[in-house]
Swiss-Prot record:
Any single biological process term in GO: acetyl-CoA biosynthetic process
Catalytic activity: acetyl-CoA + phosphate = acetyl phosphate + CoA
Family according to the record: In the N-terminal section; belongs to the CobB/CobQ family. In the C-terminal section; belongs to the phosphate acetyltransferase and butyryltransferase family.
Native species: Helicobacter pylori (strain J99 / ATCC 700824) (Campylobacter pylori J99)
Protein name in UniProt: Phosphate acetyltransferase
Length: 519
């Protein structure tokens, strides 16, 4: 589904612009929607006769939007808009997003246009009657507003390229040149904001509902996350604990757990089955029947057994337990996938306009070349699960052949192993971080690399580097760090930080459900 965001910098020329746009769209698309995210702000669009046959859809009225902004609830405003936009996407082939003229809200209007367009991943098209120099200045302003995706100016040519191919649009013109419209429709925006990525997780999880068990129901963060997930309807949920106590706490917190299954390990009919199964699995390791019965009452082991025996599809734990306490039962019971020798982790780093994969940042302290290669291949597979095309950079303090040493040898060996295991995977190294992400630096340091300058998956040489890096990016760039996401297990078990926020828990549960779709 395609879309454009029209910014009416000059409302007097909207008629000509809209007429030309619809003339090009109607032969190509049967279902075209007009979307004004905040109603009452589309000044000038109402006078465009060519749009009169199309219904205008909105997400929220202006007064409510102002209330949310004035009370610092912008994220709720954008979530409301994204939800309505997703509904339109499912029923239409093309969405024309109607932007806001400079008088709307009487403040930072271009910011509103570019912020919303970023969340909707829609190229911005500015309709203007002005000089070429002014248009160039306007484009520069858009770029300074951190919206590099805002690449269209509806004046005969898009601004995807650094030069202009034609002059300004005169008010008297009845329509734009066909070539300008054609160029415009070829414009693509490939950005994703943290909010849009989180929405995509919800949509992906809903395609195939999976059941996730949360053993730490004594923590109100878990209950609040369960409430949000319950309203979302994207996953099935199991909470472990005393039903009466959980419902009482939920009532005190004004939470809705109506569709959430609650199991008490102490009284569950699964108790005997789990004890027997645990004993059979671990008796060769010296586990006695009495110890198996005791472990079956432990919430983490009980939750792991629910997943192992197929009563749940995934488990999320860790707000009140260490990583070792979460992973140990999984390693003992669920074990690793065939051909995989270790469990590693990645973080999905949601920056302003893109999502990167960082690994390993939580599990393996000092991976060998073989382990580093395995982390790289499993991280690439994880990236694919979340629609991130993997271009893998093996990171180091040096790029290419610019240095020698034990670390460089380790990365070169890991690269050779990966290339033998998966010849189709786009991977390169050693690469410094700037060479892996910046095309200008890459052109100088690794001009023949297919990965340098455009990496999406970043593999750190050890846990020290990985953990420091993800926290540095999270804090300094205000990125949303989703994870750690465990990879390599036979079934999804994921660990939470003990400082996890409700939003972190929601994201991890959605990711676990999505992982379970591949099992």
């Amino acid at each position: 589904m395609q879309s454009l965001w029209i910014y009416p910098e000059d409302t007097e020329v909207l008629g000509a612009a809209c007429k030309s746009l619809l003339k090009a769209l109607k032969p190509r698309y049967q279902k075209i929607a007009l979307f004004s995210p905040i109603s009452g702000g589309c000044e000038g669009f109402g006078e465009c006769e060519s749009l009169s046959s199309l219904e205008v859809h909105s997400a929220i009225d202006k007064q409510k939007a102002l209330e949310l902004v004035s009370t610092a609830q912008e994220e709720l405003l954008f979530e409301t808009i994204l939800k309505r936009y997703d509904e339109l996407q499912s029923t239409h082939d093309f969405v024309i997003n109607l932007g806001y003229a400079p008088k709307f809200f009487l403040n930072a209007l271009l910011d509103l246009n570019t912020i919303l367009a970023k969340h909707l991943n829609a190229p911005v098209v500015a309709v203007a009657q002005t000089s070429l120099d002014h248009l160039k200045a306007m484009h520069s302003h858009i770029l300074k507003k951190e919206a590099p995706f805002a690449i269209g100016l509806f004046v005969g040519e898009t601004l995807e390229k650094p030069h202009f191919l034609s002059a300004s649009l005169c008010k008297q013109q009845c329509e734009l040149e066909a070539s300008a419209i054609e160029n415009l429709l070829q414009t693509k925006s490939e950005i994703i904001t943290p909010l849009a990525f989180q929405r995509s997780l919800e949509k992906k999880a809903k395609k195939q509902i999976k059941k996730v068990v949360l053993p730490e129901s004594e923590d109100e963060r878990i209950l609040k996350a369960a409430h949000r997930l319950n309203l979302m309807g994207a996953v099935g949920l199991i909470l472990l604990g005393d039903k009466e106590a959980i419902n009482s706490q939920a009532k005190n917190l004004n939470l809705n757990l109506e569709n959430v299954e609650i199991i008490n390990p102490n009284t569950s009919h699964y108790r005997e089955e789990f004890a027997k199964s645990l004993y059979e699995l671990r008796k060769s390791k010296g586990l006695s029947e009495q110890e198996a019965e005791r472990l079956a009452l432990d919430k983490t082991y009980f939750a792991t057994m629910l997943v192992h025996l197929g009563y749940a599809h995934a488990m999320v734990s860790g707000v009140n337990h260490t990583t070792a306490e979460t992973i140990r039962p999984a390693l003992q019971i669920i074990k690793t996938k065939p051909g995989v020798s270790l469990v590693s982790s990645v973080f999905l780093m949601c920056l302003d306009t893109q999502v990167f994969v960082f690994g390993d940042c939580a599990i393996i302290p000092n991976p060998s070349p073989k382990e580093l290669a395995e982390i790289a291949t499993t991280s690439a597979q994880t990236a694919k699960q979340f629609n991130i095309a993997p271009k893998v950079a093996l990171l180091s303090y040096a790029t290419g052949n610019s240095a020698q040493g034990e670390m460089i040898d380790k990365i070169n060996e890991a690269l050779t192993i990966v290339q033998k295991l998966d010849p189709q995977l786009e991977i390169d190294g050693p690469l410094q971080f700037d060479a892996s992400i910046d095309k200008g630096v890459a052109k100088k340091k690794m001009p023949n690399s297919q990965v340098a300058g455009q990496a999406s998956v970043f593999i750190f040489p050890d846990l020290n580097a990985g953990n420091i890096a993800y926290k540095a990016v999270q804090r300094s760039a205000k990125a949303v760090a989703i994870g750690p996401i465990l990879q390599g297990l036979n079934k999804p078990i994921n660990d939470l930080s003990r400082g996890a926020l409700v939003e972190d828990i929601v994201n991890t549960v959605l990711i676990s459900a999505i992982q379970a779709q591949d099992y």
